[in-house]
């Protein structure tokens, strides 16, 4: 038996035991996921085509691993200007092993991921370091001098450990992509030229 499912805007033809790589869903490794968008189901010579979905059909799989796709490099350039930008991106993906194809309208119970055993905490264990406070960040640079960085964004950068112009100027493409994802900056480093501004301000500091 095979089925054609739709997830993440793409279609996949699957059978029991197949492992597919899809865009990451809200599930951890070891958990069970159910795909309700089944476009076609086939068994032997019989094929059922949905309109657009096959009523009562579901496909169940187990999350094998969470992975990341290959790095995609985007380069931007403007003619007759010294404008060069390089941005890297890696898509969050997951490997799913198909465990069953159901056509009776009943999906198997979801399997939760096994919980990791936590080591006993000692009473004398040191407390985790708190996020940098304004006093801790006082020894750094005034990041608000960079165009596009205001007080709120400066606090977010300080909390991420970025307190000086030199740190921003030394960020690699991977570091920038990670920061933009964590702080929801969506290409602000390249758009506003923060690395170049930080490099100039670091020289003046």
Curated annotation (Swiss-Prot):
Instruction: Identify one Gene Ontology CC term for this UniProt entry.
Output: ribosome
Q: How does it assemble?
A: Part of the 50S ribosomal subunit. Contacts protein L20.
Relate the protein's function as given in its record: This protein binds to 23S rRNA in the presence of protein L20.
The biased composition feature labelled Low complexity covers: 122-137
Source domain of life is Bacteria
Q: What's the protein called, per UniProt?
A: Large ribosomal subunit protein bL21
Q: What family name appears in the similarity comment? A: Belongs to the bacterial ribosomal protein bL21 family.
What keywords tag this UniProt record?
Ribonucleoprotein, Ribosomal protein, RNA-binding, rRNA-binding
A single GO molecular function term of this UniProt record? rRNA binding
- Which Gene Ontology terms describe the biological processes this protein takes part in? translation
Work out whether the entry's keyword set contains Endoplasmic reticulum.
Answer: no
Region Disordered: start and end of each range?
107-137
